[in-house]
Regions:
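Catalytic-core signal marking the mid-to-C-terminal active-site face
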Residues: 114-198
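Core alpha/beta catalytic barrel or barrel-like domain that forms the active/cofactor pocket
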Residues: 14-40, 52-73, 93-108
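Single conserved hydrophobic/aromatic residue that forms the stacking wall/gate
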Residues: 1-8, 12
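Histidine/acidic-residue-rich catalytic or RNA/ligand-binding cores of hydrolases
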Residues: 75-78, 109-113
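Short, hinge-like loop/turn segments at secondary-structure boundaries
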Residues: 40-42, 82, 116-117
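Charged helix-capping and loop-helix junction motifs
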Residues: 79-85
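N-terminal, Lys/Arg-enriched amphipathic/low-complexity engagement segments
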Residues: 45-46
Length: 198
């Protein structure tokens, strides 16, 4: 029904205003049969998204879909995994226009500042994820292989020193210290930590 209603809207739009641009959009979620509330981060809506994205490409129109969606009431583990499992299909499906990519909580009823910052941080990773594998001369690091002998490590090589700053995506919000350091600094959890970094 998503595709037929979108197609019907497109036909109607072409009759009313021929040549006007169109965007194919979808919003799919599963539902809790216990409460009737929408649920997010489940596989079924991701499959709907993938199918609609393919249909939009077949029709030659841009595709719009949702982003970092969650039913959680706070920026907690549930918010993190549901948002991850909704933004990844959105990005991997080739969505052209993303709604609700950051800060969306409780099924869209609430916007949350901490979640907005956490989601925005994760969104900076997406280009690195979808741009594929870098096979450039620099990325292959053949000079580092030649410079570093058997039994040695690459940390001190000229190539590592020249590339370590941007070789890997780094979160601006995550804490990558040891447990002891984290504990000595007050054991601050992510939703509180982002308040000081945002």
């Amino acid at each position: 029904t998503l595709s037929s209603s979108s197609a019907a809207s497109d036909v109607y739009k072409r009759q009313v205003n021929p040549g006007a641009p169109v965007i194919f959009g979808s919003f799919a979620s599963s539902m809790s049969m216990q409460t009737g509330a929408p649920t997010f981060g489940t596989p079924e809506p991701a499959k709907v998204l993938y199918g609609c994205a393919k249909l939009a490409r077949r029709l030659g129109v841009p595709f719009r879909s949702g982003g970092s969606l969650t039913g959680s009431k706070t920026a907690d583990a549930q918010a993190a995994y549901e948002s991850t499992h909704t933004i990844l299909p959105t990005i991997m499906g080739g969505t052209n226009f993303v709604l609700h990519s950051a800060g969306w909580m409780e099924g869209g009823l609430v916007a949350d500042y901490a979640k907005l910052l956490l989601d925005a941080d994760q969104l900076t990773m997406m280009p690195k994820l979808v741009n594929g594998i870098d096979l450039s001369e620099n990325a292959q690091a053949m000079d580092a292989l030649r410079e570093t002998g058997p039994g040695q490590h690459f940390l001190g090589s000229a190539h590592t020193q020249a590339n370590f700053e941007d070789a890997f995506w780094r979160s601006q919000m995550a804490d990558n210290t040891t447990f002891e350091q984290w504990s000595s600094e007050g054991s601050v959890e992510s939703s509180a930590r982002v308040q000081t970094r945002g």
